[in-house]
Amino acid sequence: MKITAVIPIRSGSQRVKDKNLRAFADTNLMELKIKNLLQVPELTSIVVNTNSELAIEIVNKSYRGGVTTHRREEYYASSQCSGSEFFRHLGEVTDTDLFVYCPCTSPFIKPETVSQCINQFISTSDYDCLATVSSV
């Protein structure tokens, strides 16, 4: 079974410009997410789905072969695109059996948690999606 982590990076963030690529400690949110996902043995591939030239440049320079990019069409990076449309589009353009949606804005999800979620999901056919939540 091919399991792909999809990291969405939108260059036109409305509230914080390039938030996923801004300095965060000694790295940035995208690279932190990639480093965490590279530790998840269940993943067969990691794809950064983006319309950001800078994100593509960083991935191509720093993660040759280990991480790929998919250049997102501008419509799917716009505020006109609904969440449902975006997820349908991800399913259509991601060559995989199962995709794991991994936004950079959740930087503290541990690799072990991602592994547990994948294993929980593939161990049953009762569900078609799974989400992580925290009690507050």
What are these regions (language model features)?
Residues 9, 50, 131-133:
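Short beta-strand/turn micro-motifs composed of small residues
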Residues 16-39:
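Short, well-formed alpha-helical segments that are part of the catalytic scaffolds
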Residues 5, 46-48, 129:
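Hydrophobic/aromatic residues located in beta-strands of well-ordered beta-sheets
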Residues 79, 85-86, 98, 106-136:
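Conserved core of the sugar-phosphate nucleotidyltransferase
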Residues 1-17:
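N-terminal nucleotide-binding beta1-loop-alpha1 segment
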